[in-house]
Amino acid sequence: MKKILFLLACAIACVYGERYCAMTESSTSCRNSTAGNCASCFETGDLIWHLANWNFSWSVILIIFITVLQYGRPQFSWFVCGIKMLIMWLLWPIVLALTIFNAYLEYRVSRYVMFGFSVAGATVTFILWIMYFVRSIQLYRRTKSWWSFNPETSAILCVSALGRSYVLPLEGVPTGVTLTLLSGNLCAEGFKIAGGMNIDNLPKYVMVALPVRTIVYTLVGKKLKASSATGWAYYVKSKAGDYSTDARTDNLSEHEKLLHMV
């Protein structure tokens, strides 16, 4: 495997440059040589030298990164999901700081073309960051849920039952919503969102909140077994508008609760 890696390094290395020997006692030593054996020495610059000495460390970091991206979902692990959210939050300020710093360095050495690219990158990053906050705040106004600030959340399912509001982040707007009741546990999209419920506690409508509007889903069918508190209820889109999912419950009819505006 090492031979293959060294040959690959030879293929992608620059023709002109220092020959860094990977077979010497010191991994950081280099020598000027005309040896043509790519298995012992390879043509390289700083990038290939870095990969040759830090490839294991980078492989471990990338494995962790892939694991976080692949399994950073609530259905797998809430802990990994939290790490993924933290990484995504930190990427915006880190990228913005790097582009600003690079723009400063390029301006100091009078490389104005690269300075322009750096300024453009910083501007785009800042605009995208502001757009994220605007959409998150709009979604939070409708749902009062901190899931609104998850960068991957584009919609939030809101279910009112037993005098409480339950929320579940979604990646998109569903055509229909199915609530499943299993031995008194209310589940949506495969997640348990409430417990200790019976068939009389199922809501007549549920809502899916987006940053710009709220979609109301009305109950159209259900099949329940009262003896075991088990069954399902299906909801379809009925209307959309500037509704709040956190409707007041004092002295309001069901229709007034539904039409309670933000």
From Swiss-Prot:
Region Interaction with N protein: start-end pairs: 237-252
Cell location: Virion membrane; Host Golgi apparatus membrane
UniProt keyword Hydrolase present: no
Topology of this chain in the membrane: Multi-pass membrane protein
Virion surface side of membrane: 19-47, 99-112
Any single Gene Ontology cellular-component annotation: membrane
Keyword entries, A-Z: Glycoprotein, Host Golgi apparatus, Host membrane, Membrane, Transmembrane, Transmembrane helix, Viral envelope protein, Viral matrix protein, Virion
Subunit and partners: Homomultimer. Interacts with envelope E protein in the budding compartment of the host cell, which is located between endoplasmic reticulum and the Golgi complex. Forms a complex with HE and S proteins. Interacts with nucleocapsid N protein. This interaction probably participates in RNA packaging into the virus.
UniProt-recorded name of the protein: Membrane protein
Organism for this UniProt entry: Canine coronavirus (strain Insavc-1)
